[in-house]
């Protein structure tokens, strides 16, 4: 099944056109087209090795693509790298924390490297979380270190935030705190975020758009609510009325092969009742991701 892209006609804060990247024989990105709406929080979801980190690194001008182009807030990072990077805040999975320095000295280090860095803004974000500025950074918990990395990114007052699996090593409470600080900042600043994760349940409460990346290709790109509304799940091959098969995977408990179906967007409301009558269940976002990844692998199976 090809890429499925939901309707989007607004302004893109981050755009990729025909983006491809290869590492020797491995295709990391395969003709990726992506438009992240301004003011949105977009979830970039896919398994390890899907190309999520490569996509973010190309957008940051850390990796040069083999073909295609990128625009960050209207600026090509490969033609105007300095200007583009001033518009981007970057949060890697493992933030660069200087363990021998205090939290505040880490912020001062960031200020010395970024001319527009707002150190007071970052301090306020950390103080909201009761993280002492005089604490040695090497003694921070994993969640606190992640918050420090986010505070550094937010201190740039960037219009676009790129977050590469920042929740991967956090416990549930730390994840919740991280998401809350991120959303507060986005609402107050009017910025845009692309938040990558290999677990959709980690990010579904924070995001309003879902992009599924598998095998270097975008498998689905649509508003989060549309992904929920237009997909159904059955344990049989017979389709719900007006539905198209997406992919099949082994369901929870390993007892049944489940099939994900997509209803036509314009008939989703009417199709819901018919789908339920035909024995179809609501599909969770995890089910949606599994179905599209299974279709992309061409095997028909994606173990849950």
Regions found by a protein language model. Name each.
Residues 14, 29-31, 85:
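Conserved structural motif at the start of ABC-family nucleotide-binding domains
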Residues 45-47:
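The feature captures the beta-strand-to-loop junction immediately N-terminal to the Walker
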Residues 60:
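Helix-to-loop junction immediately C-terminal to a conserved catalytic motif
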Residues 68-76, 83-84:
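Conserved ABC transporter NBD signature motif
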Residues 93-148:
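ABC-family P-loop ATPase nucleotide-binding domains
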Residues 161-165, 170:
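Catalytic Walker B motif of ABC-type/P-loop ATPase nucleotide-binding domains
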Residues 177-263:
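ABC transporter nucleotide-binding domain
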């Amino acid at each position: 099944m090809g890429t499925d892209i939901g309707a989007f006609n607004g302004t893109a804060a981050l755009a990729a056109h025909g983006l491809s990247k290869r590492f020797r024989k491995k295709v990391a990105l395969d003709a990726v087209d992506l438009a992240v709406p301004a003011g949105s929080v977009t979830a970039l979801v896919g398994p390890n090795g899907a190309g999520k980190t490569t996509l973010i690194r190309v957008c940051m001008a850390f990796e040069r693509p083999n073909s295609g182009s990128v625009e960050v807030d209207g600026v090509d990072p490969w033609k105007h790298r300095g200007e583009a990077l001033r518009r981007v805040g970057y949060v890697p999975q493992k933030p660069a924390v200087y363990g021998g320095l205090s939290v505040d000295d880490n912020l001062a280090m960031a200020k010395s490297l970024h001319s527009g860095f707002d150190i007071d803004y970052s301090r306020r974000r950390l103080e909201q979380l009761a993280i002492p500025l005089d604490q040695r950074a090497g003694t921070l918990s994993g969640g606190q270190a992640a918050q420090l990395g986010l505070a550094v990114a937010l201190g740039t007052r960037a219009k676009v935030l790129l977050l590469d699996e920042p929740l991967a090593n956090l416990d549930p409470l730390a994840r919740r705190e991280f998401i809350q600080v991120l959303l507060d900042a986005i609402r107050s600043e009017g910025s845009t975020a692309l938040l990558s994760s290999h677990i959709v349940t980690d990010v579904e409460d924070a995001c309003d758009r879902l992009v599924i990346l598998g095998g270097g290709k975008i498998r689905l790109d649509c508003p989060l609510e549309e992904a929920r509304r237009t997909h159904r799940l059955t344990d049989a091959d017979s389709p719900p009325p007006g539905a198209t098969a997406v992919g099949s995977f082994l369901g929870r408990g390993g007892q049944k092969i489940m099939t994900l179906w997509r209803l036509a967007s314009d008939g989703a409301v009417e199709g819901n009742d018919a789908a339920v009558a035909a024995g179809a269940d609501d599909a969770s976002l995890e089910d949606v991701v599994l179905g599209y990844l299974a279709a992309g692998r061409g095997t028909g199976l994606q173990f849950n």
